């Protein structure tokens, strides 16, 4: 009797969970056997809810009474709605590189000896860091859904302001300054997407079938960023073909303004969605978390992930931002703007297969070894480009293909897997803060790359990027943990047990491997006017 799975003890409550029927142990059954039965049934209930054990009947219908295939698509839609807004990051990062090229051609006198264009490319990263750090706390405190809605609204407003940037009395320098200011707030919205959208996507992917969870996360986050990169290169090219070389002012404004499409489409879906079940189940007030224990358990792991993300973004975002400039340096001096943008589009399409293949192999090899494989292969192609750069620059087609493969391997390895590792190597209670810190340090690397790779020493840049890829691969091999399909549940259980062993108790308000105990209902607290006023104040603020 003890240790077996008994379907009669579980009933469908019509909602999202299976509820275990409470039954008293029989007279013949000793209390020790009852506890053992409870533990075994509870473990199998966890396995059942996570999809680890699926009966033939459950293979056709899920616990909500619908098709299991339909349920999987519903869960994937939740993952997509949470993560796909990162397309704005890729679009804004890449389209602004093309916009900078246009502004340099339109206003050579105002931009030749002025750092405004470089600041336009950099300032969004500063705002992104602010958004990542602040909304990391916000998403853990107020919920993933609230954070995503706020981030979407910020993206819509700031993108509209960037599109209509205008200087006082038509001043070009004033327009550039306004563009810098607006892109800072755009960066905050983009940064908010990381600890809100990406974290929600990782938690929602936990509801998918085992074997698809890593791929789903990478496709809707890194794949979305890469698709944004491609669209960010394609849109200016199409606009130049439509309006011509003599109407570049409308080209750069529309290139920015079309970035409104993504957040506007996503906003109603995000309003309708719910917080991931994992977050709802394991939400803990930040004041109740034993931060010293968290630092001891996750401090070094977070440091390694931050270092890897920093080094990767140091080259990755710089190459993305300056890809059109790099192509300009390879093309003849009399090449048209449309031709330059066209080759830039071709190069950026190589991002997409890297993200898709990276998602597939992340489930097959595991995120750790997929990351290492991509880094090693990328370094090989980088050293090749450095050694044969003088020959490649005279053959634009060959240069673009080799350069594109270099970018593909970057997305295959660290591009998708570093975000996956950051979102699934911490407990749910601190996942937003943990992920936000790692992503913010990565963006610091992107800022450093904007300045370090902003010159014309392209050959040396490939040398440096390849050497850094080898360094990151060694770090990952030595210190990055292996992740299983059940890594989110495993990390929560590990954190619970560590809190109990350290004497802090269970932060999630249930004891591992302990039977349920009947407790007397708590008496209602006495009326406290101060607490009542405080609650009313917080209620007004939140509303």
Curated annotation (Swiss-Prot):
Residues 1-12, 38-60 have a biased composition (Basic and acidic residues). GO terms for molecular function: glycerophosphodiester transmembrane transporter activity. Residues 104-116, 168-171, 244-253, 323-340, 390-395, 454-460 are extracellular. One of its GO terms (cellular component) is plasma membrane. It is a multi-pass membrane protein. The keyword Transmembrane applies. Residues 1-82, 138-146, 193-222, 275-301, 362-368, 417-432, 482-543 are cytoplasmic. It holds the Pfam family Sugar_tr. Gene3D superfamilies: MFS general substrate transporter like domains. Keywords: Membrane, Transmembrane, Transmembrane helix, Transport. It is found in: Membrane. The chain crosses the membrane at residues 83-103, 117-137, 147-167, 172-192, 223-243, 254-274, 302-322, 341-361, 369-389, 396-416, 433-453, 461-481. This is Probable metabolite transport protein C1271.09. The lineage of its organism: Eukaryota, Fungi, Dikarya, Ascomycota, Taphrinomycotina.
């Amino acid at each position: 009797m003890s240790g077996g799975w008994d379907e009669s003890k579980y009933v469908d409550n019509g909602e999202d969970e299976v509820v275990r029927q409470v039954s008293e142990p029989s007279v013949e059954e000793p209390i020790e056997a009852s506890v053992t039965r409870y533990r075994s049934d509870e473990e199998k209930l966890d396995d059942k809810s996570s999809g680890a054990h699926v009966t033939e009947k459950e293979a056709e219908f899920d616990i909500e009474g619908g098709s299991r295939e339909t349920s999987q698509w519903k869960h994937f839609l939740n993952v997509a709605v949470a993560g796909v807004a990162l397309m704005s990051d890729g679009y804004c990062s890449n389209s602004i590189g093309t916009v900078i090229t246009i502004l340099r051609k339109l206003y050579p006198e105002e931009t030749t000896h002025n750092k405004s264009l470089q600041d336009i490319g950099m300032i969004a990263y500063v705002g992104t860091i602010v958004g990542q750090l602040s909304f990391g706390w916000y998403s853990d405190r107020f919920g993933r859904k609230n954070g995503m809605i706020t981030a979407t609204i910020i993206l819509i407003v700031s993108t509209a302001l960037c599109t209509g940037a205008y200087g006082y009395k038509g001043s070009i320098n004033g327009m550039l300054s306004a563009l810098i200011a607006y892109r800072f707030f755009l960066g905050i919205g983009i940064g908010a997407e990381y600890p809100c959208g990406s974290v929600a996507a990782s938690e929602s992917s936990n509801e998918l079938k085992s074997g698809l969870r890593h791929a789903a996360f990478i496709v809707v986050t890194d794949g979305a960023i890469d698709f944004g990169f491609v669209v960010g290169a394609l849109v200016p090219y199409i606009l130049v073909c439509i309006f011509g070389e003599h109407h570049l002012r409308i080209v750069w404004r529309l290139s920015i303004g079309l970035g409104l499409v993504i957040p506007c489409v996503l906003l109603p879906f995000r309003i309708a969605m719910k917080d991931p079940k994992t977050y709802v189940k394991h939400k803990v007030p930040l004041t109740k978390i034993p931060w010293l224990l968290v630092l001891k358990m996750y401090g070094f792991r977070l440091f390694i992930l931050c270092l890897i993300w920093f080094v990767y973004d140091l080259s990755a975002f710089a190459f993305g931002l300056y890809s059109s400039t790099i192509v300009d340096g390879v093309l003849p001096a009399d090449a048209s703007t449309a031709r330059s943008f066209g080759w830039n589009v071709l190069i950026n399409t190589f991002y997409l297969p890297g993200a898709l293949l990276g998602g597939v192999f992340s489930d097959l090899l595991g995120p750790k070894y997929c990351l290492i494989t991509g880094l090693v292969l990328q370094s090989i192609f980088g050293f090749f480009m450095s050694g044969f750069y003088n020959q490649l620059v005279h053959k634009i087609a060959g240069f673009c293909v080799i350069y594109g493969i270099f970018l593909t391997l970057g997305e295959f390895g660290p591009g998708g897997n570093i975000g996956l590792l950051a979102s699934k190597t911490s407990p749910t209670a601190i996942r937003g803060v943990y992920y936000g810190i790692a992503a913010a340090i990565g963006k610091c690397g992107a800022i450093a790359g904007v300045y370090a790779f902003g010159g014309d020493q392209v050959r040396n840049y490939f040398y440096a990027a390849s050497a850094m890829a080898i360094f990151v691969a060694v770090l990952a091999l030595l210190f990055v943990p292996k992740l299983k399909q059940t890594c989110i549940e495993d990390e929560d259980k590990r954190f619970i047990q560590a809190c109990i062993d350290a004497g802090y108790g269970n932060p999630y308000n249930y004891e591992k491997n302990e039977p349920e105990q009947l407790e007397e209902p708590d008496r209602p607290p006495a009326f406290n006017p101060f607490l009542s006023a405080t609650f009313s104040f917080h209620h007004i603020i939140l509303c």
